[in-house]
């Protein structure tokens, strides 16, 4: 970027995009130089001379200069340019990313393809208009990493000289309806019946596909965004059966094919910054020459080494996930990797909207060095429908992340849906909104605060005021924050670690892999999130009946917090609704808040009913049972209100790949069944100490 100067009568904006330009500009204006020369840093300086005011952006690099320019553009838009003060800015978190499961093609699926969102977004993945808007939104919110996840993307990305028939022309989608019977490890994501009925979404030879992704990466590079592909292993969709390639771990032909494909990926995409790999979820835990880590090194590591022999100056980052492997085996197998080698940890497992300080990384921290730092996978498998927004929670979550000597960065996103265009609205825009655009406030909070957690709430308030001038911004912001407290409150109380075990929008888990709808008995017997300081119902009952101190937040306190947030949301909404006028986005945003408030009231009443039943289980007193029934009847009414509010804005039924079909109004009979469960409850059926449940293990030594 060259130095840019914009005049506006008695006002001038000047932007410098490297240290030399910044020093020269600071000297010319007689202002202090930029303090940080680190990547993405910038300073804003205000100078006045001879009646002319100059706002200068001193960038340490092009990205820093862009961020400074965005600050000035924002100040112009919000009407605060005259008060924009001189200040220095550097990122708190160096790399701030999005995790995006990419449904490339029915023949090269992502981990999320057996769901409505993935199927509807296949064509969008091959639209440059989509990626231009998506990446531009990322940059505005200060994200600088785009991680693209797919089980086996190579046939849709490269043409390998040794395996030319593997490369796939055109983009195809199956005409067979998806369902909830697929494996949760991806090993049957391509089925013969799916391949028997394909339609061509877009005519596109492999050469055009390569040109397309080069253009996407070039646009990302121009916006300061690094791009990475991530894979799971061993999947050979699109290549299976060709040249003797199979998914068998001891098949040397498969290893050779992967090695050549990785080499070509590096060589084909000069702007690709690296690759991320997984030692699963389709690998055997072998201890021979075909062990997980030896296989990965021979397939991926040697492929990268081969590419670097041809391009010795090429930098290429390797990110190895902890998932389904051990630290010792990883570090031993990859000790000779010739470039940056980092790890990746599922930070809050599947639920970022839980507590601001997830404890799961603590056992791993001592083994993480500054030479091999970890990335955080920050999974959002809590909220698929609604517009979330609570700066207090986001700021606390970010501040609790490990320091830079341990953490390379993070990428956030879901496995259970796809952050492409939304396809659930009952009154969609044309074309349909990108999820990142629909949920702009949430993405703004996480992106801007991860760059600078000291940003004041006043910035977000001014932004809301500009976007929704019909309503008082402080009131709108408070209602949004209160509604957004529902998801963390309930998820820390009723914990299901991985995505298929807990989807709080629907009180649901996968119907076969877990329990389906969680009943009031499940709540009585449920566990709370480790490290949350919240007591489960059985822990609370034990303390209450023994007369010992409550060593934590009680279930009734959780219920009260949910009720309080929901009541405050609905109180504020009454006035906001009266002012919404014809602003469609405002109306829909308030509708999301209303839905979240009714959901919070539902969970509060259900927890109270579960507490009553836990006492009845010990006392046998009918008064406890009747109190439970009353609370569960209230829960039913709140669910009905939730269903009405939800279906005003969203299709009532969607298929998600991790929990199956979610039908909010269709679940009313299941909610009613809780009342019947209470009526027929037999005392003495809940032990004081419950069996330990299966738990995800994100770290192994």
Predicted regions and their residues:
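Mature N-terminal, pre-catalytic/accessory segment of carbohydrate-active enzymes
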Residues: 1-152, 282, 299, 551-701
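Generic detector of short, locally flexible boundary/turn motifs and exposed helical patches
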Residues: 18-24, 62-65, 110-113, 192-194, ...
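C-terminal non-catalytic alpha-helical accessory regions
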Residues: 83, 129, 183, 414-663, ...
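Catalytic-core regions of glycoside hydrolase
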Residues: 101, 121, 144, 156-167, ...
